[in-house]
Amino acid sequence: MSNIISSNRPGSGIKWQWPSIHPEGRKFLLIAGIVTLCFWLLGWEILGWLMLGVTLWVGAFFRDPVRVTPASDDMIIAPADGLITQIAEVPPPPEIAGPDGLGDAPMLRVSIFMSVFDVHINRTPVAGTLRKLVYIPGKFVNADLDKASEENERQHFVVERADGVRIGFTQIAGLVARRIMPFVSMGSELATGQRVGLIRFGSRVDVYLPAGTTPKVLLGQRTLAGETVIARIGQAATIDGIGQ
């Protein structure tokens, strides 16, 4: 997909377009479509309508919309579409702690829960070099639970910025999600908002923010991967909000 440069300069504009389907989802869409067609050919109309709904949902699940990523070195961008369910200070995961990872000091963790209706393409929150990529097999408990960070199947990423600051994020499988797929490898040079992985069928992403980072999101806020600014590097005023 070609890059689209957006601007807020007078006279600039962009046309809406249908989101493409990620290649990983095309086989599922094809299978669902074939089953739907078979039901209709056999005269099983009720099942045909049900499978048509499933086919449309599969297409929506694997949609891969274009996102316009803010270009600023101090911004940390949401890696996932979803709902902010937790903002807490916690130790970094042991698999990516220590001097070659995120260190051992407590970090601010922002958790984003993705429902089965959200886009499930995940993106890197900052530009830099992928220093660690660690897959951990595990359980499939509800991804909205706190223990999912330690018990569920998960994939850890540690990205080091050009200034040496390291940021971690973790894809976590859930009750329905049974497959985590990274698109990148150790040592990859990543751009902010670049597609880095996919979790199939509902899950969560945790972001581990370094010291001196100010969160710019609130509990209950929705995010868009590659677009929503969730934090800024450096001290600044925190924000409050009202649910209404």
From Swiss-Prot:
Q: Which PANTHER family match?
A: ARCHAETIDYLSERINE DECARBOXYLASE PROENZYME-RELATED
Q: How is it modified after translation?
A: Is synthesized initially as an inactive proenzyme. Formation of the active enzyme involves a self-maturation process in which the active site pyruvoyl group is generated from an internal serine residue via an autocatalytic post-translational modification. Two non-identical subunits are generated from the proenzyme in this reaction, and the pyruvate is formed at the N-terminus of the alpha chain, which is derived from the carboxyl end of the proenzyme.
Which keywords fit this entry according to its UniProt record? Answer: Cell membrane, Decarboxylase, Lipid biosynthesis, Lipid metabolism, Lyase, Membrane, Phospholipid biosynthesis, Phospholipid metabolism, Pyruvate, Zymogen
The protein depicted here goes by the name Phosphatidylserine decarboxylase proenzyme
Q: What is the scientific name of the source organism?
A: Sphingopyxis alaskensis (strain DSM 13593 / LMG 18877 / RB2256)
Gene encoding the protein: psd
Q: Give the residues annotated as active site.
A: 203 (schiff-base intermediate with substrate)
Sites annotated Cleavage (non-hydrolytic): 202-203
Instruction: Please give, as recorded in its UniProt entry, the membrane topology of this protein.
Output: Peripheral membrane protein
Q: How does it assemble?
A: Heterodimer of a large membrane-associated beta subunit and a small pyruvoyl-containing alpha subunit.
Compartments where located: Cell membrane
The reactions it catalyses are: a 1,2-diacyl-sn-glycero-3-phospho-L-serine + H(+) = a 1,2-diacyl-sn-glycero-3-phosphoethanolamine + CO2
Q: What does this protein do?
A: Catalyzes the formation of phosphatidylethanolamine (PtdEtn) from phosphatidylserine (PtdSer).
By sequence similarity, the record places it as follows: Belongs to the phosphatidylserine decarboxylase family. PSD-A subfamily.
Q: Does the keyword Zinc-finger apply?
A: no
Return the HAMAP family for the record.
PS_decarb_PSD_A
